[in-house]
């Protein structure tokens, strides 16, 4: 965070005050000596962000595929050596996402519908989601101070991975990146995200085979279609004691 002296106007009264503003940096990822992408992101958990981004973009199958990862915070560059499983020609098919920070993905999220079908078996009581979301939306100290970040969390029996970033997709990649390195069982996790759920958010969740995604906000039509085709549980507007179930209601008992 960085503090600025600003003028606050409330009910016609002007006041000079200090205001905390969230930080934004351009992180350029260099993969095996070639510049891959520049992510506009918050300057924290950058190694987790890189690991999660490479995984959800399909460049690798596990964290151990990375043989070297260093982040230069003076130049805001991440240098990655990795055993890549992605066809090189797809590098020219960048898709700019709808999320904050002008994110990039290297596949069409609609293609996920043709490849992933989640198994049944994982269930949770509806009341549990209300408790999870209540704690989730009050967990971000950065949001409390700046109002300028999104959050994502992975919740399972082993605990919670919680991350902030100015972009929803970045926050999710950070959580996934840490989960990969801790080798958590993604198939037994619930993913939480703040704000709108678009197709690329659902695609990242399905890449990990996570069965449940819940948000305090709304999904897009493509997010709902992908979730239904993949048998994923998608919850929106989880607030107070209510929620909308857009797909996969069989997992809520």
Residue spans for each PLM region:
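Intrinsically disordered, low-complexity regions enriched in acidic/Ser/Thr/Pro/Gln residues
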Residues: 1-155, 160-162
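Short, solvent-exposed amphipathic alpha-helical segments in soluble enzyme
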Residues: 44-45, 54-55, 168-170, 178-181, ...
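Extended, folded domain segments that form the structural surfaces/walls around functional sites
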Residues: 104, 118, 122-133, 169-182, ...
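Glycine- and Gly-Pro-enriched alpha-helical subdomains that act as flexible
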Residues: 142-191, 195
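General beta-strand structural signal in soluble alpha/beta enzymes
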Residues: 162-163, 193, 214-215, 234-237
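Short beta->alpha linker loops
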Residues: 167, 196-197, 218-219, 238-241
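Extracellular/luminal Protease-associated
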Residues: 182-219, 227
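C-terminal binding/interaction regions
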Residues: 222-253
């Amino acid at each position: 965070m960085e503090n600025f002296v600003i003028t606050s106007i409330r009910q016609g009264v002007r006041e000079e005050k200090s205001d905390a503003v969230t930080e934004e940096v351009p992180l350029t990822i260099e993969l095996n000596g070639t510049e891959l992408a520049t992510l506009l992101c918050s300057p924290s958990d950058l190694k987790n962000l890189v690991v999660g981004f490479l995984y959800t973009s399909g460049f690798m199958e596990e964290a151990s595929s990375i043989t070297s990862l260093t982040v230069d915070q003076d130049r805001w560059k991440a240098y990655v050596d990795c055993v890549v499983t992605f066809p090189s020609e797809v590098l020219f098919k960048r898709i700019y996402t709808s999320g904050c920070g002008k994110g990039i993905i290297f596949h069409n999220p609609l293609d996920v519908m043709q490849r992933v079908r989640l198994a049944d078996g994982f269930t949770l009581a509806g009341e549990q989601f209300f408790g999870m979301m209540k704690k989730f939306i009050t967990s971000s100290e950065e949001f409390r101070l700046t109002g300028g970040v999104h959050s994502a969390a992975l919740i399972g029996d082993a605990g919670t991975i919680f991350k902030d970033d100015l972009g929803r997709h970045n926050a999710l990649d950070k959580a996934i990146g840490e989960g990969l390195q801790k080798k958590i069982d993604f198939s037994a996790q619930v993913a939480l995200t703040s704000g709108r759920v678009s197709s690329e958010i659902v695609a990242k969740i399905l890449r990990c085979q996570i069965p449940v995604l819940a948000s305090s906000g709304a999904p897009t039509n493509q997010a709902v279609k992908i979730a239904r085709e993949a048998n994923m549980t998608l919850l929106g507007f989880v607030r107070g004691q209510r929620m909308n179930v857009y797909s996969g209601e069989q997992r809520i008992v």
